[in-house]
Amino acid sequence: GFALQSRGTGFTLEEDRVNTYAPGKRPFHTIIPAFITREGEPYVSFGLTGGGMQPQGHVQIVMNIVDFGMNLQEAGDAPRIRHEYLNGADIVRLESGFDYETIRKLMTMGHTIAFGFERFGGYQAIGVQG
């Protein structure tokens, strides 16, 4: 026998899928530190924990900093969205802090919304000032 560690759960046994288990394939993995530059200079180094939340959380943190002008603390404190997609799930999980109008719009768009999920992962960041 052999072990695939927990990331092996990202494989599927359904044929003709991108993540179909096959010899030589690697499972989806999310060990992804992030680095943001500003005008070619180091600006922010950060990372998130949380398995499948990592790539989703990275995008949200970058948007909070770059697009919405938040500082590092605000970017980490802002509520996040987690899309559960493995094993046939299709659920949008929300951290507390989203206003009712945002939740209503997501539901109107047909999303299945869930609350109270604790695995959004931790966030750590180092920023360069000046």
Which residues does each PLM region occupy?
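Intein/HINT protein-splicing elements and their conserved insertion hotspots or analogous self-processing inserts
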Residues: 117, 129-130
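Proteins synthesized as precursors that undergo proteolytic processing into mature forms
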Residues: 1-117
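Short beta-strand scaffold segments in enzyme catalytic cores
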Residues: 33-35, 122-129
